[in-house]
Amino acid sequence: MGPLMVLFCLLFLYPGLADSAPSCPQNVNISGGTFTLSHGWAPGSLLTYSCPQGLYPSPASRLCKSSGQWQTPGATRSLSKAVCKPVRCPAPVSFENGIYTPRLGSYPVGGNVSFECEDGFILRGSPVRQCRPNGMWDGETAVCDNGAGHCPNPGISLGAVRTGFRFGHGDKVRYRCSSNLVLTGSSERECQGNGVWSGTEPICRQPYSYDFPEDVAPALGTSFSHMLGATNPTQKTKESLGRKIQIQRSGHLNLYLLLDCSQSVSENDFLIFKESASLMVDRIFSFEINVSVAIITFASEPKVLMSVLNDNSRDMTEVISSLENANYKDHENGTGTNTYAALNSVYLMMNNQMRLLGMETMAWQEIRHAIILLTDGKSNMGGSPKTAVDHIREILNINQKRNDYLDIYAIGVGKLDVDWRELNELGSKKDGERHAFILQDTKALHQVFEHMLDVSKLTDTICGVGNMSANASDQERTPWHVTIKPKSQETCRGALISDQWVLTAAHCFRDGNDHSLWRVNVGDPKSQWGKEFLIEKAVISPGFDVFAKKNQGILEFYGDDIALLKLAQKVKMSTHARPICLPCTMEANLALRRPQGSTCRDHENELLNKQSVPAHFVALNGSKLNINLKMGVEWTSCAEVVSQEKTMFPNLTDVREVVTDQFLCSGTQEDESPCKGESGGAVFLERRFRFFQVGLVSWGLYNPCLGSADKNSRKRAPRSKVPPPRDFHINLFRMQPWLRQHLGDVLNFLPL
């Protein structure tokens, strides 16, 4: 278990100590575990113990004092030998209106506890819960409820004791934890008029417990995902998105990142902190929200690296630059942890902004504020940080009606003897949410910020969002990808470009115009997330005629190979179904973070700005494959290979009769080639963690799936093949008039 690193700043607090300085003894091994040192054996070095999963170290850490002796934080007795002890989960103290089995004093990792209700009561929550290796129970609190109260029975979490048994409007319940367990969440909750309990469900946890990234990421990601979906200014109809850090379209988000730079962090961890923070900033700025970011590092004193009052706080490049310039030694002369001063810096920033905008103005009152505090929760100077939080709540006028305007997240990283009580005291308390967490190490922190944006929570039609987490399915990575088929035989692919329109290739429909039997499969066809849609209308480009140049000896010609399908129903947005961004639209402009007034030409210059542009298409088996789109002089050399194809074009004298400027070209030796059946699928790029369709698969000189019925089997062309593989894709920048004609009421197009 790594040192409890809770901030984005690692400071070497004792550089250049004299050779005469004492060093601490080296007989500090732990039975069954290992240890790390932040600064060797010198005074100021933090020793952190680690144990295998399912065990925890006792003590968790020791600090080398200036006297040359080790001290265990919080210990009153002399040093004892460090050992690894088994992790245990707390037992129920009581269970109302039911029984639980087995009845133990505490439960080992892997142990289960089961719940049953008495007659007349209905079980809500998890009937069986298992003790996890982090000392936390899986599942949800089991409650036996008869529905008689104005609010539902709030239950009693494992290890907790509750006083208060009335659940009417205005009634209160109070919680405390048994033995040495620590309470996180709300110690008191009130039944509100809307039938919901105030605050956050209390949890009693072992002092050594921590949270898994897969638990923290959804909790943070739900808040930010709702916020991102709620701030899409291009949505034409309002949808109810629920609470979370929700911002009205006329509003703005101030995001404050507070990074603790104390002696318990190392330089390597500091680099991971900065990388994680930069990743989070990059992800948030990749969505079309109005956001300003403040960055504050602190030890004994705070250092404001970026203020929300600075215009650059709205510029992702400037914000990330400020993070990158955060110096490991910025706080080397400060040995304390002054969380109060860091939060007070936020308060002063808010106060200055309120004076600038005017306390009574909508411009001030509609700003939402989110504070992410990365710390060990061990403030040891400057006063109580809760006082600063109270000042912040007061200046923002946070009450029941304005509770959504402030969220404070307190996140600890590592496993020192964390002051859970202080972390819990600082974090916001809101129904159904958690705002205080402890992560095991900096790697876990990086995972959280990388995967915190759960796109399944975006009910808006925000475009170009793929789930890139490690456990995401192929369909979740490319949720715009659809399959088009007549009855049962798959023929083509396509891409969702809105909640009701699919873009595909015209040649998929050249055998007839009756589409009543055709289906479009949206989502993962191999799971419950797949759904078939009827086609309400097919719009085929009138310029497409595969035999248009047959009398010139060109047996097949694929100019204007583009079509639109309007689905009979709108697609419900989810992690498995979401439109891709089309260039030259306001939706794509926001995703690219381009300024207002940008044009279609600006998008082309940004997306297709190199001689060889890395791009992707989706294979028959759903995987994402790589190609390189050739531009400029490389486009010419790529296309000229067609002259070697004597079967389709026996008398070709001018390559441009076949490969017009409507086509993008790929297929060099390192590229994958599309198979028959992959036509119509999107050719797309990634920019700023968003995906943009620049073309669609049309035709090629080589079929890597020929002769194989296995969707996972692709055969590369031999190097000696004549002609070598080449693939051609309709260039959407060259089809703008047609797209605007048919999608003008669906998408918001930019000037050409």
Curated annotation (Swiss-Prot):
List the active-site residues. Answer: H507, D561, S679
Which positions does UniProt annotate with glycan attachment?
Answer: N29, N112, N290, N333, N467, N471, N621, N651
Task: List the residue(s) that the UniProt entry marks as the site Cleavage.
Answer: R243, K244
Query: Domain named Peptidase S1: which ranges?
Result: 464-744
Mutagenesis / variant outcome for changing N344A: Promotes partial resistance to degradation, slightly increasing half-life of the protein
User: PROSITE patterns in the record, alphabetically?
Assistant: SUSHI (PS50923), TRYPSIN_DOM (PS50240), TRYPSIN_HIS (PS00134), TRYPSIN_SER (PS00135), VWFA (PS50234)
> What are the coiled-coil residue ranges?
none
Instruction: Name the InterPro entries on file.
Output: Compl_C2_B (IPR011360), Peptidase_S1_PA (IPR009003), Peptidase_S1_PA_chymotrypsin (IPR043504), Peptidase_S1A (IPR001314), Sushi/SCR/CCP_sf (IPR035976), Sushi_SCR_CCP_dom (IPR000436), Trypsin_dom (IPR001254), TRYPSIN_HIS (IPR018114)
Domain VWFA positions: 254-452
GO cellular-component term (any):
extracellular exosome
Q: Which domain of life is it from?
A: Eukaryota
Where does the protein principally reside?
secreted
**EC number from the UniProt entry:** 3.4.21.43
Q: Which UniProt keywords apply?
A: Age-related macular degeneration, Complement pathway, Disease variant, Disulfide bond, Glycoprotein, Hydrolase, Immunity, Innate immunity, Metal-binding, Protease, Repeat, Secreted, Serine protease, Signal, Sushi
What SMART domains does the annotation carry? CCP, Tryp_SPc, VWA
Per the UniProt record, the associated disease is: Macular degeneration, age-related, 14: A form of age-related macular degeneration, a multifactorial eye disease and the most common cause of irreversible vision loss in the developed world. In most patients, the disease is manifest as ophthalmoscopically visible yellowish accumulations of protein and lipid that lie beneath the retinal pigment epithelium and within an elastin-containing structure known as Bruch membrane.
Report the domain remarks: The MIDAS-like motif in the VWFA domain binds divalent metal cations.
Q: Write the protein's name.
A: Complement C2
**Protein species of origin:** Homo sapiens (Human)
